[in-house]
Amino acid sequence: MKKIVLTSITLCFLIVGCNQTKKVVLDTPTVLLSGIFTVITINGEDISSSAVLQFNKADKKIWGNAGCNDFAGTYTQNAGSLNIGQLSSTKAYCEGAMKNEYAIQKVLRNVGSFDISNGNLTLYSATEKKPLLTAIKNKE
């Protein structure tokens, strides 16, 4: 008799416990990456070129220029994570502009997350919370 009572009580707890669901609420709203940004730092160093990145949220495309060549590709985002796909690029050689172009494309290959605060975009490394690039959103 004791076994039947204990089994019944255990069964009641299991039924009640399995019937409840938990909600996960995100503390921060999802920010859609969109617009044109002027790059101001790469790996913590100020740059003097007019490098720009443009994110199109409708078709998830990225476009950019660091003073000479255009590059383009696709991106996906989920909350604060960011993954940039394979980039295509024009192949002109421009004296002085190539250093920033290579640096920006390397950053875009290694980005894992982003943050937008007060119109400033920061791209972070995929392996650590290290800022790789900062940019200011252009007025539209």
Where are these regions (language model features)?
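Bacterial Sec-dependent N-terminal signal peptides
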Residues: 1-29
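Lipid interaction determinants
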Residues: 18-140
